[in-house]
Amino acid sequence: VTVVSVMTPEVIALFYAADMVGATLNLVDPRYSVEGIHEYIEEVDSHLLVCLNVVYERCRQAAKRTNVEKVIVLSPADSLPPVMAVGYKLTTPDKNKYASNVIRWKQFIKGGEGQSTAAEPYDPDHACIVVHTGGTTGSPKGVMLTDNCFNALAQQFRAYDKLFHRGQKLMNIMPPFIAYGYACGVHLPLVLGFTVIIIPNLDPAKLGSLVLKHKPEHMFGVPTHYQQLAADPKLRDKDLSFIINYAAGGDSLSRGAEQTVNDFLAAH
């Protein structure tokens, strides 16, 4: 199942539902071109495509000359409270002309009412997702990650119970189409009983304000996120003692930058 989307509650539900029936999610960056999306659909021979409505036209073009049979379309409004959903639809009207093979998300969910929820037996070697490398050593490559990969990560963190407790919060600012975003930002916190705060499309300039608003004990990001926090004037003289574990990955962090961030955290 190829998924072209940012992180939304629907994409998280889809991850677990697909895994339970033995399917694999092929996660694709929604910023990719028609050609790029087409290549990744072909790579795994997807028969089902799931995409955001804002990238539907690109996905429709990309699905031509592939084995895609059905397209499930998500809207950012699907998870919003009614008043906010109406506001979103008024300010961002959906002008797509959908083909006959399209199923809207809510229609898809309604169609499953009363159906069997029997799951496949657990298979630790089942590939739950396919993500793609950055292409730094050539063309991007698909990487299959198993259920065991995801569960091993969660169990490693669970073993350190001095830091991680049920009921804490993790702010997920990472996209779903990188392994880091899904494994550390979704599966890990849910296994540990955390509340996950989803930021689907992060504006880096607002990161400090989001941290102050939600006060998450945990966050996973890249080094530049923490350098930005350390330099954010909105955080000056603020109490950030709620922070327990803010981790960086995905890129290198110079010794000087690491010291700057650590000094900032120690001072707050």
Which functions belong to the PLM regions below?
Residues 1-32, 44, 173-175:
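Conserved AMP-binding/adenylate-forming
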Residues 22, 135-136, 193:
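Conserved G/P- and acidic residue-centered "switch" motifs that form tight phosphate/ATP-binding loops
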Residues 34, 42, 54, 60-100, ...:
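Conserved adenylate-forming
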Residues 35, 47, 106, 125, ...:
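Structural detector for helix-capping/boundary residues
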Residues 95-132, 139, 162-169:
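Conserved pre-ATP/AMP-binding loop-to-beta segment of ANL
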Residues 128-152:
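Conserved AMP-binding A3 loop
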Residues 151-169, 177-218, 232:
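Conserved AMP-binding/adenylation subdomain of ANL enzymes
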